[in-house]
Amino acid sequence: MARTILVIHGAGEPRRRRSKVYWEPLLEESLGRGYRVQAPRMPRPEHPQYWTWARRIDVLIGSTRKPILVGHSFGASVLLKYLAETVRRPALAGLFLIATPFWGPDFPEFALPPDFGARLGDLSPICLYHSRDDTEVPFEHMERYRRVLPHATVRVLDDRGHEFNQAQFPELAADIRGLALQRAV
């Protein structure tokens, strides 16, 4: 049975992807047999609202047995908030977060609860990916996540920008394939 990977895109991304190379469509191919990637369009990506995205994520996760979650940018931050605030957190195989903004008090709709690290302490694995040359989400945001989620695996990259515009994302594919190895041990 194929493992389901749910990829939650960032705000405004479907419009921006039209002319760029992007890793997401090739993720399933790079993972090989045994994986099925779903990348649903989220509601109003040009003007996102947390609750509309959270409801959509709830439906997607609820219809999938122990999914692997991958979020990019705004999508990654919504996944974190959803998982931190969900009373009955669904069973997940792993959480992979790319270029994730750390929303502060200026953005209360998107800000995480102050104790979100403790709330997510039993969620494993969590992998964080961030490029030092990201011009949209400062590298310091990843450092903040690293401090609050000390059990997370952190992958620091140097030349991927914010969009991670490339045909392949070998680090992500390797980490996802590593889940199967962890289960086999």
What are these regions (language model features)?
Residues 70-80:
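Gly/Ala-rich beta-loop-alpha elbow adjacent to hydrolase catalytic centers
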Residues 138-147:
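Short alpha-helix in the alpha/beta-hydrolase fold that links the catalytic acid
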Residues 36, 146-163:
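Catalytic histidine neighborhood in serine/cysteine hydrolases
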Residues 122, 127-130, 134:
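Short beta-strand/loop motif that positions the catalytic acidic residue
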Residues 14, 104, 132-137:
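Acidic catalytic loop of the alpha/beta-hydrolase fold
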Residues 89-103:
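A conserved short beta-strand
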Residues 48, 160-173:
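Catalytic histidine-centered segment of alpha/beta-hydrolase-like enzymes
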Residues 2-46:
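Short, surface-exposed "cap/lid" segments of acyl-processing enzymes
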